[in-house]
Design a protein with these regions (language model features):
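Generic helix N-cap/helix-start motif at coil->alpha-helix transitions
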Residues: 5-9, 16-23, 50-57, 86-97, ...
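C-terminal structured domain segments
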Residues: 388-396, 404-447
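Charged, amphipathic alpha-helical stretches
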Residues: 1-77
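Substrate-recognition/specificity elements adjacent to catalytic centers across diverse enzyme folds
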Residues: 21-26, 30-32, 133, 138-177
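N-terminal nucleotide-handling cores and adjacent loading/scaffold lobes of large enzymes
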Residues: 56-65, 82-83, 95-102
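Amphipathic alpha-helical scaffolding segments comprising HEAT/armadillo-like alpha-solenoid repeats
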Residues: 9, 35-45, 69-84, 105-116, ...
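Core register positions within helices of long alpha-helical scaffolds
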Residues: 98-101, 130, 164, 238, ...
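Charged, low-complexity intrinsically disordered segments
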Residues: 149-153, 161, 166, 170-203, ...
Length: 465
């Protein structure tokens, strides 16, 4: 899996990859062939930083509709030779989701492609989930034979079938197929086996047992670390349940590193909640300074942690970043300068895609730091993360007087529903594009309810929208 190559933000391709509203507006104004080429590149080479979190499918599907775009490129991608060897969901997931939205909008060619791919494609389960939401009963029943043929009548095949039934996001196709006398017995057995497997996992936990003490919890955490599965967070919860007052010296010693790395991480995560105002705990966090210690500090939010954050915020390491994030989330007006400085330094040093920016951008908006507007605008334009851009839009709504007449307008076409919601609440209707767009969002059955609620709050009998 390769990292996506993101084009410059001022290009049509770069705008579409980022999912910006200006991407749609520029595509509709560009030559159709150029717009379709950029759109197809985005759909076939997923540009998202985190494909499990960021949204693009509805955004691209709407643009296919506006451009009356053919689906030949998507078809070639789905049924190409790579599909025989690359079974990763990420390769075809975005294209299948786009087809799902197009099918909802009445594009029969998209529906037919989904059916074909569900019958023969490697990522058939994703296509089937899309069809479960959009196809009729007859269409779904026609897929029973090719889908079930994937699972041979062997012990291994039946186990795979039980897992597929158990893990399906949408149970509708499987329920329909179970109604058929041809498949009822086999699918009923698969469903029951899946339920039994789930019950069996719940009944055979591998974690703590009654009667465990502090040392047993530390040993469990150490065993997890040896197996490559850090368990210090659940171990800290166990520690809270089993620790007695007389165990405090042993826990403090473990937090200082006397019992190994896993025990130290477990003890620190326990102490930051058990003794949040104890300066000695913060000293232990600072002395450790590693990832578990920083994660433990991030769970603190009291006055002592804030006081220490004001001292640590200038550090160039992860503890300094955690201190800045805490001030952004919990600090007061007097901390605005520190948050602004951290925001500027992070953009300057790590660029507009740094994960550290999420908390700092939120903090700039929460504290209404007007001086942050220029750097927030830079983050908005340049970041490849649509989630971070949405946070920047919310922060700009609180800090930038020009937001309503500027970025808020293009945000009505953004790929993220939360960003469209912000735009629907703030975009100035003096712009001739705003009123028609609000009406379209209000009438679009694919639009999210929160966005439509925001639109309805703007469409009143007294308004001109």
């Amino acid at each position: 899996m390769f990292e996506p190559v993101i084009a410059p933000s001022g290009t049509l391709l770069g705008l579409l990859q980022r999912g910006r509203g200006d991407g749609t507006l520029h595509a509709l104004a560009a030559p159709r062939s150029e717009a379709l080429a950029a759109l197809n590149q985005c759909v076939l080479r997923d540009p998202r930083q985190d494909w499990q979190v960021e949204n693009r499918s509805l955004y691209y599907a709407r643009l296919y509709l506006d451009l009356d775009g053919p689906l030949g490129e998507i078809e070639a991608h789905l049924f190409g030779a790579d599909d025989l060897f690359d079974e990763e969901d990420h390769r075809t997931g975005l294209a299948l989701s786009v087809l799902g939205h197009l099918a909802s909008y009445g594009r029969d060619d998209a529906l037919m492609l989904l059916r074909r791919y569900a019958a023969s494609g490697a990522n058939w389960a994703w296509a089937l989930d899309e069809l479960a939401l959009r196809d009729d009963d007859a269409g779904l029943r026609s897929l029973a034979a090719p889908v079930l043929a994937r699972f041979p009548a062997t012990p291994e095949g039946e186990a795979r079938l039980a897992a597929a039934v158990r893990d399906a996001y949408e149970p509708r196709p499987w329920a329909l197929w179970e109604e058929s006398p041809l498949y009822a017995e086999r699918l009923r057995a698969a469903r029951q086996q899946g339920s039994f497997d789930r019950w069996q996992r719940q009944m055979t936990p591998s974690g703590p047992r009654p009667g465990w003490g502090v040392q047993a919890v530390f040993d469990w955490a150490a065993d997890g670390l040896r197996r490559g599965t850090p368990l210090h967070v659940p171990a800290a919860r166990c520690l809270a349940a089993v620790a007695a007052p007389e165990d405090r010296p042993a826990i403090l010693a473990a937090a200082a590193g006397a019992c190994g790395e896993a025990a130290r991480a477990t003890a620190l995560h326990h102490l930051v909640l058990a003794e949040p105002e104890n300066p000695a705990v913060l000293d232990l966090v600072e002395a450790a300074g590693d990832e578990p210690a920083v994660a433990a500090y991030e769970r603190m939010c009291g006055p002592a942690a804030l006081d220490r954050a004001r001292l640590w915020v200038h550090r160039p390491d992860a503890l300094g970043a955690a201190a800045a994030a805490l001030l952004a989330a919990r600090g007061g007006a007097d901390d605005a300068g520190l948050v602004l400085g951290a925001l500027r330094n992070t953009v300057r040093g790590a660029g507009p895609d740094s994960v550290r920016l999420f908390a700092l951008v939120d903090g700039a908006g929460r504290l209404s730091i007007g001086c942050a507007a220029p750097v927030l605008r830079h983050v908005y334009r340049e970041t490849a993360s649509s989630h971070l851009r949405g946070r920047a839009a919310r922060a700009l709504a609180a800090t930038d007087p020009t937001f309503a007449a500027g970025f808020a307008v293009e945000c009505l076409w953004d790929c993220e529903e939360t960003t469209r919601e912000v735009a629907a609440r703030h975009a100035e209707t003096a712009d001739a594009r705003v009123a028609p767009r609000l009406r379209r969002l209000a009438a679009d059955p694919a639009e999210e309810e929160d966005v439509q609620s925001a639109v309805r709050s703007r469409i009143t009998p007294e308004s001109a929208v």
